[in-house]
From Swiss-Prot:
One GO BP annotation of this record: translation
SUPFAM superfamilies: Ribosomal protein S10
Name of this chain's protein: Small ribosomal subunit protein uS10
Assembly description: Part of the 30S ribosomal subunit.
Family label: Belongs to the universal ribosomal protein uS10 family.
PROSITE patterns documented for this protein: RIBOSOMAL_S10
NCBIfam families reported for this sequence: PRK00596.1, rpsJ_bact
Length: 102
């Protein structure tokens, strides 16, 4: 393998699925002989939305909603061809967004 590091960034709304997926990636990479740094928790992005409860009057009655995006960072150092093949074949949860940089 030409590159000496693979950087994997995981995003999800559910931190439990995110931690399970990160553990699967770490276990797969270590099984093939690569070194792993992480999972490193990145700051959680919190988006808050305020909406009126009533469609017509009573502006003081409002609801607040929030959406949290949890992120983790993994570095796989010294990957070999078996590591890349195993990571490609890995089936992660549907609610986890995976971004890979070589």
């Amino acid at each position: 393998m030409d590159s000496s590091k693979i950087r994997i960034r995981l995003k999800s709304y559910d931190y439990r699925m995110l931690d399970i997926s990160a553990a699967e990636i770490v276990e797969t990479a270590r099984r093939t002989g690569a070194r792993v740094c992480g999972p490193i928790p990145l700051p959680t992005k919190i988006e808050r939305f305020t909406v009126l409860r009533s469609p017509h009057v009573d502006k003081n009655a409002r609801d607040q909603f929030e959406q949290r995006t949890h992120k983790r960072l993994l570095d796989i150092l010294d990957p070999n061809d078996k590591t890349v093949d195993a990571l490609i074949k890995l089936d992660l949860a549907a609610g986890v967004d995976v971004e890979i940089k070589l």
